């Protein structure tokens, strides 16, 4: 019985299922080894898309998220962007083929598609998916062919969008418009007739016409640019009233025969010259959607070409597809069954199915949906194996003992066979007191030896954005990790984001560290702010990630002595696992702590006789060593693609553990051998092919013997001996530089990497006597050697050297790496020689910039044969660029050397300034026709594929519009002066649009801030601004040129450039009847004018002007543009432009026609184009208008786009100081112009995309190993002082203990809403003491705090502390004087040093303590409030608020009443005066809502706090009427909301009066002198209060006043000396930001109620060093007094100290003598400081201290905010402490700002 016929139908739309769910299913199944073909297809498709995306221009690349699989692509809606068509086409192709492959694997189907009974069909992009099946004979071939289908789909989408957007730009608002509408009820022939009529009547160019793209019996699809379709449907009555629907086609035009041709198809299929393999035959019939017949293609190449041609040019005829399928089915007359496979259903498919059922009623027709399988679960499967890429080490850096502070010095040390061990230097610890060879002294070391880095404290803090204090507290090994990481990255040429593998989100760090000497010893002597981030291990590489903005994993590993190499192995694993694409790895060790010496010595690890004696008979332990090293590693394929220098290749790496050793610290040969075997198997390397082993080699008897056994058994076995030409060399770097512990492995690796570079093995110096007898004696017989002298290690031709690097940990870990030679670089790209190259140098400080210049000059002097192109590539594309910059464009090395020498000798560095923090705006200016010359932009066209492709694409569009090609003009094939106006003008506009895209898409210049075009150049400007589509711009330029050629006589009129104003011309030429006739054509500047007229008239004018000394130049154009000569074309041009759509500009357009700036979408219209041809070009007026609006200024960067920078001179004249770069220049090589322009942009802060500049022939350039960055170093070092590591051995639980508040039950019955737990209460006859704890997060307390919010955070007001004081005062008084009815109290000298802010985490306790002591004989009680650590219950040493209570001798209060009665009439008189002023509208009357609305300027009160009903205010005087709430809302002495209601009038006066500068300042109260009441406040009581505030004469910015509280016209309370301090409003956020992540132990943040007063100190006061204080909690803001703010004089030295900051005075320029000599940024900063402090600039002498100048902590905050807001400088307020003098500050500013 014959088999069934099969039809597989591939649609052109995604199924209705969730797209992400579909791809998630594919991705999930792709991890299952049951779906091997699917997995391979997904991997290949991902790789194809990665490669295609990598070829896109930089701005388009940025639209695509990083993806290692397809899932991220499904998360992005690409439809609104330029990659919509490309991504949707590619993803649809992947989805259909993936579902097809997965279905076969899920069903375990064998291939059953026979050529004679199988038909494939598809619609649109579905044809490409179908092609993957049509070319295959089994499933594996579908995988291979399918990847190529994905590639073509993507390219097709990119090209369609690119071409279509040149026909019509996208909407400015991002909305999607359809490029196709379906019309039902019309025939294709009728609609074609209607469309032809419409296109003809409107004069629509063929390129832009509306056309039919698809048709069947019942419907027709109409396609075209969206605006043209809409216009057609509006204009055509037939279309307007038809049944139509917009289709979801948003990315451009397909099926357009008038738009694409054979050359287009070729560019889609072979954009980079690649050729699709032609040997693959077509296996299955695939039907054309145009003819319904199988494509007449026999090979893959032919099939892809046929499909691409059909997609781009062929109309879809659905009826033909149906007919073809029916015909193919009918031919198999014996088939009883028809099986159809498709993806869900669609209208087209339903129609096809209906036709089949109708035609073949006797056949069984079945359908299979290829999608449902993806949602099924096929059981757990094992994942696929990990990637097996080789890895490339591309960068390295180090700091090693013996002065080896770079790689060259390290190699020099090794090559010379030096031993670096010495005794412990004094900067580590005092050897005399800490060394005892007898071992009798507890905690002393028994060995005095070690290997040490020279001055490990040297560090460039400013480079890494660290303050001196932070640098000092940061572990030196962490600092050197940063430094070596940078140097390794620099060597590797890593520039973040330059290539896919340098994506910062995919760069990881792995560092090994096994000790914490600095944190445990040096920094712990005075624990500071940066103790945790400066000392905890995780911050070593965490800081690297943070500084470089790396988003990959950050791991700090401790595997004891193998930590460094284990970190490298972990880094390699991350690369193999796909967790990162580039890794930094290394090891860190800096020795300072004698404890570790003692511990290792007592554990018998250390040698007492000196250096590590590896494999020596006298080996007695290891010698400790410093060391810091970093390496950069990538996958090999990435390194090769990135054109990196590969130092060596990592084949495999592994770590295991000596689990079977006899003790945890004893090595185990068996485990070591297992590890070797594992890495050799992974690398597929024969052990006999290893030619070098770098031993762990500690120099211990046990270690050497075990390692010798393991190495010899595996790499030189007796059973399989090495040949004589297979020697195995061994060595150990520890015999030179000691055992670096965590850095030992990285030191070994660096040594081997240097051996690869130098082709040499250093001598092994570890055997000073004789070889250890435990080592086998047959080494030579086994071809094993420990070279005792330098030994050559050459790389033979065609051979690869392989090496092993070992590192073992004392804890039992074994790490091994297998290395091999880097592959020899194959240069496959011929380099386009450029006449001129840019060279750039940069640094983060002036001093480093000067040093970098000097070192580069020295390098060139030593290497005069250096290739300039390679040098340019290295400095531009492969270096990180910093703010201090020098740049030049040169054509040879001698010219560069001259530039560098001049920079050094003329001190050019000191003249430079750092680039601005915010890059300047860019304006594009487009030149006109006068810039034309033959061969324009020829160099760029020939050398830059991107520019060439852009020109050819634009030229193709132009030709499709019916105009001639302009490429011959660019190639110089047209003689000068022979080109027509049409060709000339098209050449200029095409070149200008292509240049603009070159700047924007390739060279990385951002979208311009504005554009301006001069005459003809305005068409290019409008195209770039999106006003005109590219196609319309070319159409108008070409059509206008044709009209001019046809209707204007060339040579009859001309244009004359005159160096004079139009007024001067009129005056000199005259206006009489016999005066020559002329017209204004162009007003280029205020002194440059172009006039036009007949030749005769212009000659006559010239004869009049030149004798007057006025320069005149004929403009080289054949017509007089912008004159009456253009009148002949106006009407015809108006008709041509009428149908052209105009869009709202995407950037401002400086209009030379209107002399203004255009922002809207109506000003530029068809009439504008006609007027611009006839009317003058008012270039100067347009520029003036832009300057007036602030769109351009002296800081603006101008990019002149055109063949010659004609507009540049105009801009320079109009905009003083304008910076202009050119794109091309007549009679100058294009790359000479471009190089200079790129340098100018780079120096201005608009760093070009250097990578793209060199991309076309990057593989032909070499990355040079130039001198490393020269640091501006200072020695930040905290010296270990004393002998406390020895002394602690003798302490037996002694020493003082901090007073703590323990968590015990309350000892008193006192408990209120604010006092929660009394921990101590003692009472005797005359004194009483109470200590209590309260929790701000307690509901009652928290509600009180939130009644007074500032900057959205709850702040404890003074009324809270007042209630607590009165509560405790009354309680203790009654304990001493029982039976007292009413206790009168006077709260005196109340001052809040810093207020409390409620943490946002209410689940975390926020405790505080109150301590009170009452002395009855003196009738006085002292009060103090303290912060409390919630974790330890330990209270702070210093209180945050203090006060006292005085108890009057008269307990009735009569004395107070009498006192106040004497002034009551005065207060009443002032209240009446204010009422009178209010009646005359001279004082303000505020209602309650208005009063509290004013208060919101600073503080927002809860409703219960809003007691003031009415306020009358005049200047700083006011009274208010008050009604208290009727509810106490808690348990209080006096509710805080009542206290606030009767007292916060003073706050309103200061913060709401027009007499206060509330715009720049706000006012907060630090306390009062006295607060007393003769009677308690009553619920619902009505009161009146009065206050007048005065400035305090003895304290700047402080106000004080007395506030009176009256009830029924009687004074019942007074708050005396109520103070308010003025605070700059710019500090609002700094002071009053809520702490959202407060830790459990944290104390509250500050509030506006208590910015502390800064007490003035005598300027001559000697500031003494401060004792260590309790660490300031992260959410407090303590503004210290001057004495505590100023650093001690001992702290201002850069020599080792135990204090705090090492101020960099010795390494920087000496401070200037006086402020008047300071210029630049430093000078401006001093002017700002003088303005803010009220000092004269002359008073800011270099030796003046900021303490003496009155710059207190509050002023420091103000100055830092001012410097940020006004000068853009991010400067911490602590800088005024770290740079205590004006000279220190200016030195710092000159270096880093």
UniProtKB/Swiss-Prot annotation:
Region named Product template (PT) domain: 1312-1634
S-adenosyl-L-methionine in keyword set: no
Principal EC category: transferase
Ranges where the Ketosynthase family 3 (KS3) domain occurs: 388-821
Protein name: Non-reducing polyketide synthase adaA
Catalytic activity reported: holo-[ACP] + 9 malonyl-CoA + acetyl-CoA + 9 H(+) = 3-(2,4-dioxopentyl)-3,6,8,9-tetrahydroxy-1-oxo-1,2,3,4-tetrahydroanthracene-2-carboxyl-[ACP] + 9 CO2 + 10 CoA + 2 H2O
Species for this entry: Aspergillus niger (strain ATCC MYA-4892 / CBS 513.88 / FGSC A1513)
CC cofactor note: Binds 1 phosphopantetheine covalently.
Lineage: Eukaryota, Fungi, Dikarya, Ascomycota, Pezizomycotina
Record region (Disordered): 1642-1714
Start-end of Polar residues biased regions: 1660-1681
InterPro entries noted in UniProt: Ac_transferase_dom_sf, ACP-like_sf, Acyl_transferase_dom, Acyl_Trfase/lysoPLipase, Ketoacyl_synth_AS, Ketoacyl_synth_C, Ketoacyl_synth_N, Malonyl_transacylase_ACP-bd
SUPFAM superfamilies: ACP-like, FabD/lysophospholipase-like, Probable ACP-binding domain of malonyl-CoA ACP transacylase, Thiolase-like
Pathway(s) this gene product operates in, as recorded in its UniProt entry: Secondary metabolite biosynthesis
UniProt keyword annotations, A-Z: Acyltransferase, Phosphopantetheine, Phosphoprotein, Transferase
Domain note: Multidomain protein; including a starter unit:ACP transacylase (SAT) that selects the starter unit; a ketosynthase (KS) that catalyzes repeated decarboxylative condensation to elongate the polyketide backbone; a malonyl-CoA:ACP transacylase (MAT) that selects and transfers the extender unit malonyl-CoA; a product template (PT) domain that controls the immediate cyclization regioselectivity of the reactive polyketide backbone; and an acyl-carrier protein (ACP) that serves as the tether of the growing and completed polyketide via its phosphopantetheinyl arm.
Modification sites for O-(pantetheine 4'-phosphoryl)serine: 1753
């Amino acid at each position: 019985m014959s088999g069934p016929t099969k039809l597989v139908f591939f649609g052109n739309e995604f199924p209705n299922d969730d797209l992400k769910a579909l791809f998630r299913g594919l991705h999930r199944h792709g991890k299952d080894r049951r779906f091997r073909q699917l997995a391979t297809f997904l991997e290949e498709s991902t790789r194809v898309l990665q490669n295609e995306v990598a070829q896109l221009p930089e701005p388009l690349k940025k639209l695509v998220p990083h993806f290692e699989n397809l899932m991220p692509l499904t998360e992005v809606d690409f439809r609104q962007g330029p990659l919509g068509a490309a991504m949707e086409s590619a993803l649809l192709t992947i989805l259909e083929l993936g579902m097809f492959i997965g279905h076969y694997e899920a069903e375990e189907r064998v291939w059953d598609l026979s050529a004679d009974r199988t038909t494939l069909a598809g619609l649109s992009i579905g044809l490409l998916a179908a092609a993957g099946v049509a070319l295959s004979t089994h499933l594996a071939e579908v995988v291979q062919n399918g990847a190529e289908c994905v590639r073509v789909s993507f390219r097709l989408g990119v090209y369609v969008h690119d071409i279509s957007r040149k026909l019509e730009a996208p909407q400015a608002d991002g909305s999607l418009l359809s490029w196709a509408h379906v019309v039902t009820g019309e025939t294709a022939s009728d609609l074609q007739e209607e469309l032809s009529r419409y296109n003809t009547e409107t004069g629509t160019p063929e390129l832009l016409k509306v056309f039919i793209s698809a048709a069947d019996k019942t419907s027709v699809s109409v396609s075209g640019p969206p605006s043209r379709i809409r216009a057609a449907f509006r204009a055509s009555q037939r279309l307007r009233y038809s049944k139509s629907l917009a289709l979801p086609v948003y990315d451009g035009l397909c099926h357009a025969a008038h738009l694409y041709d054979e050359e287009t198809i070729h560019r889609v299929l072979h954009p980079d010259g690649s050729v699709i393999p032609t040997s693959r035959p077509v296996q299955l019939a695939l039907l054309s959607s145009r003819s319904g017949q199988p494509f007449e293609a026999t090979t893959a190449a032919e099939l892809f070409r046929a499909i691409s041609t059909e997609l781009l040019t062929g109309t879809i005829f659905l009826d033909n597809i149906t007919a073809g399928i029916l015909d193919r089915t009918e031919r198999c007359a014996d088939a009883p069954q028809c099986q159809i496979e498709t993806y869900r259903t669609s209208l087209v498919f339903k129609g096809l199915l209906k036709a089949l059922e109708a035609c073949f009623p006797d056949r069984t027709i079945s359908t299979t949906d290829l999608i449902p399988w993806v949602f099924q679960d096929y059981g757990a499967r094992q994942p696929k194996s990990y990637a097996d890429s080789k890895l490339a080490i591309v960068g390295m850096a180090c700091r090693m003992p013996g002065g080896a502070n770079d790689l060259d010095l390290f190699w020099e040390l090794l090559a010379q066979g030096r031993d670096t061990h010495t005794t412990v230097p004094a900067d580590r610890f005092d050897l005399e007191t800490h060394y005892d060879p007898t071992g009798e002294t507890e905690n002393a070391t028994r060995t005095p030896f070690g290997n040490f880095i020279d001055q490990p404290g040297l560090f460039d803090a400013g480079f890494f954005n660290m303050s001196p204090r932070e640098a000092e507290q940061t572990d030196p090994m962490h600092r050197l990790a940063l430094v070596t990481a940078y140097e390794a990255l620099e060597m590797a040429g890593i520039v973040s984001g330059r290539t896919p593998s340098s994506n910062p989100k995919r760069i990881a760090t792995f560092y090994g560290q096994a000790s914490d000497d600095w944190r445990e010893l040096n920094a712990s002597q005075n624990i500071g702010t940066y103790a945790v981030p400066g000392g905890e291990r995780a911050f070593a590489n965490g800081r690297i990630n943070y500084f470089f903005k790396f988003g990959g994993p950050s791991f700090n590993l401790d595997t004891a002595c193998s930590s460094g190499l284990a970190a490298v192995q972990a880094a390699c694993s991350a690369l193999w696992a796909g967790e990162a694409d580039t890794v930094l790895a290394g090891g860190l060790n800096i020795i300072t702590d004698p404890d570790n010496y003692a511990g290792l010595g007592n554990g018998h690890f250390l040698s007492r006789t000196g250096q590590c004696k590896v494999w020596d008979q006298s080996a007695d332990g290891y010698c400790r060593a410093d060391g810091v090293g970093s390496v950069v590693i990538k996958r090999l394929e990435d390194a090769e693609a990135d054109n990196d220098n590969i130092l060596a290749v990592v084949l495999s790496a592994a770590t295991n553990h000596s689990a079977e050793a006899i003790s945890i610290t004893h090595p185990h040969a068996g485990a070591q051998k297992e590890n070797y075997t594992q890495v050799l198997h992974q690398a597929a390397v024969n052990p006999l092919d290893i030619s070098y082993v770098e031993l762990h080699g500690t120099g211990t008897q046990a270690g050497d013997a075990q390692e010798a056994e393991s190495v010899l058994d595996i790499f030189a076995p007796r059973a399989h001996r090495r040949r004589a030409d297979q020697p195995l060399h061994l060595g150990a770097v520890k015999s030179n530089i000691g055992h670096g512990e965590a850095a030992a492995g990285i030191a070994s690796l660096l040594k081997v990497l240097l051996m690869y570079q130098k082709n040499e093995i250093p001598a092994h110096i570890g055997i000073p006597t004789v070889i250890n007898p435990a080592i086998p004696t047959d080494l030579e017989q086994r071809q094993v050697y420990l070279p005792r002298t330098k030994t050559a290690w050459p790389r033979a031709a065609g051979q690869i050297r392989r090496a092993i690097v070992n590192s073992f940990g004392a804890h039992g870990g074994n790490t091994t790496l297998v290395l091999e030679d880097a592959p020899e670089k194959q240069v496959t790209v011929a380099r386009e020689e450029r006449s001129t190259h840019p060279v750039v140098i940069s640094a983060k400080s002036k001093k480093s910039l000067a040093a970098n210049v000097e070192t580069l000059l020295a390098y060139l002097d030593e290497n005069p044969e250096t290739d300039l192109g390679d040098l340019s590539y290295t400095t531009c594309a492969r270096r990180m660029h910093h703010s201090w910059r020098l740049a030049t464009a040169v054509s040879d090395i001698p010219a560069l050397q001259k530039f560098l020498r001049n920079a050094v000798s003329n001190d050019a560095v000191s003249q430079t300034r750092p680039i601005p923090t915010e890059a300047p705006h860019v304006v594009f200016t487009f030149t006109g026709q006068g810039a034309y010359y033959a061969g324009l932009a020829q160099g760029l066209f020939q050398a830059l594929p991107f520019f060439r492709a852009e020109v050819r694409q634009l030229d193709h569009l132009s030709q499709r519009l019916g105009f001639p090609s302009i490429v011959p003009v660019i190639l110089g094939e047209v003689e000068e002066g022979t080109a027509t106006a049409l060709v000339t003008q098209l050449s200029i506009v095409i070149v200008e649009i292509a240049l603009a895209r070159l700047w924007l898409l390739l060279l990385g210049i951002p979208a311009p801030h504005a554009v301006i075009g001069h005459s003809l150049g305005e068409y290019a400007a409008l195209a770039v601004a999106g006003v005109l589509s590219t196609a319309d711009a070319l159409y108008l330029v070409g059509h206008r040129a044709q009209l001019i050629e046809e209707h204007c006589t060339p040579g009859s009129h001309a244009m004359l450039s005159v160096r004079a104003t139009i007024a001067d011309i009129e005056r000199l030429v005259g206006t009489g009847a016999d005066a020559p006739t002329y017209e204004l054509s162009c007003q280029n500047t205020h002194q440059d004018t172009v006039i036009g007229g007949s030749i005769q008239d212009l000659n006559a004018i010239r004869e009049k002007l030149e004798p007057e000394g006025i320069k005149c130049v004929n403009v080289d154009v054949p017509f007089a543009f912008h004159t009456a000569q253009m009148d002949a074309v106006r009407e015809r041009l108006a008709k041509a432009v009428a149908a052209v759509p105009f869009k709202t500009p995407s950037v401002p357009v400086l209009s030379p026609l209107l002399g203004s700036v255009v922002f809207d979408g109506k000003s530029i219209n068809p009439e504008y184009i006609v007027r611009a041809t006839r009317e003058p070009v008012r270039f100067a007026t347009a520029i003036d208008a832009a300057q007036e609006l602030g769109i351009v200024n002296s800081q603006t960067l101008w990019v002149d786009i055109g063949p010659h920078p004609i507009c540049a001179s105009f801009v320079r004249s109009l905009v003083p100081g304008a910076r202009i770069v050119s794109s091309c220049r007549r009679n100058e090589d294009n790359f000479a112009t471009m190089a200079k322009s790129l340098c100018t942009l780079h120096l201005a802060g608009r760093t070009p995309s250097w990578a793209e500049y060199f991309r076309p022939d990057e593989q032909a350039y070499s990355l040079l190993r130039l001198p490393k960055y020269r640091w501006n170093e200072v020695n930040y070092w905290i010296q270990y002082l004393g002998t406390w590591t020895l002394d602690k051995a003798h302490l037996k639980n002694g020493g003082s203990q901090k007073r703590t508040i323990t968590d015990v039950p309350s000892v008193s019955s006192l408990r209120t809403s604010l006092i929660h737990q009394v921990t101590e209460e003692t009472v005797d006859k005359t004194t009483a003491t109470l200590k209590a704890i309260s929790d701000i997060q307690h509901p009652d307390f928290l509600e009180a705090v939130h009644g007074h919010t500032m900057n959205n955070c709850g702040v404890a007001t003074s009324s809270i502390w007042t209630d607590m004081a009165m509560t405790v005062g009354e309680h203790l008084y009654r304990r001493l004087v029982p039976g007292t009815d009413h206790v009168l109290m006077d709260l005196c000298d109340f001052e809040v040093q810093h207020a409390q802010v409620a943490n946002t985490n209410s689940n975390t306790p926020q405790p505080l303590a109150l301590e009170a002591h009452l002395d009855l004989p003196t009738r006085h009680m002292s009060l103090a409030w303290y912060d409390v650590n919630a974790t330890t219950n330990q209270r702070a040493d210093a209180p945050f608020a203090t006060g006292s209570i005085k108890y009057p001798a008269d307990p009735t209060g009569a004395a107070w009443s009498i006192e106040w009665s004497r002034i009551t009439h005065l207060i009443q008189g002032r209240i009446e005066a204010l009422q009178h002023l209010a009646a005359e509208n001279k004082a303000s009357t505020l209602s309650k809502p208005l009063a509290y609305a004013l208060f919101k300027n600073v503080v927002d009160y809860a409703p219960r706090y809003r007691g003031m009903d009415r306020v009358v205010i005049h200047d700083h005087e006011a009274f208010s009427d008050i009604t208290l709430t009727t509810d106490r809302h808690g348990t209080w002495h006096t509710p805080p909301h009542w206290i606030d209601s009767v007292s916060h009038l003073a706050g309103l006066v200061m913060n709401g009066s027009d007499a206060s500068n509330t715009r720049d300042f706000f006012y907060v109260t630090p306390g009062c002198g006295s607060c007393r009441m003769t009677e308690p406040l009553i619920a619902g009581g009505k009161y009146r209060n009065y206050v007048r505030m005065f400035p305090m004469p003895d304290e700047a910015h402080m106000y004080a006043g007395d506030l009176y509280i009256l009830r029924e016209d009687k004074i019942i309370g007074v708050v005396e000396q109520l103070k308010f301090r003025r605070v700059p409003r710019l500090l609002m956020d700094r002071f009053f930001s809520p702490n959202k992540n407060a830790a459990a132990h944290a104390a509250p943040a500050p509030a506006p109620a208590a910015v502390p007063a800064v007490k003035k100190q005598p300027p001559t006061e000697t500031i003494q060093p401060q004792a260590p204080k309790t660490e300031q909690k992260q959410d407090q803001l303590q503004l210290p007094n001057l004495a505590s703010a100023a650093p001690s004089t001992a702290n201002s030295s850069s020599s080792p100290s135990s204090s705090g900051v090492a101020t960099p005075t010795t390494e920087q320029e000496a401070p200037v003598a006086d402020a008047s000599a300071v210029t630049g940024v430093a000078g401006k900063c001093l002017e700002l400081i003088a303005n803010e402090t009220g000092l004269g600039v002359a008073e800011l002498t270099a030796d003046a201290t900021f303490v003496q100048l009155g710059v207190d902590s509050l002023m420091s905050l103000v100055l830092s905010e001012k410097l940020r807001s006004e000068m853009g400088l991010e400067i911490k307020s602590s800088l005024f402490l770290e740079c205590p003098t004006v000279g220190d500050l200016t030195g710092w500013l000159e270096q880093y700002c």
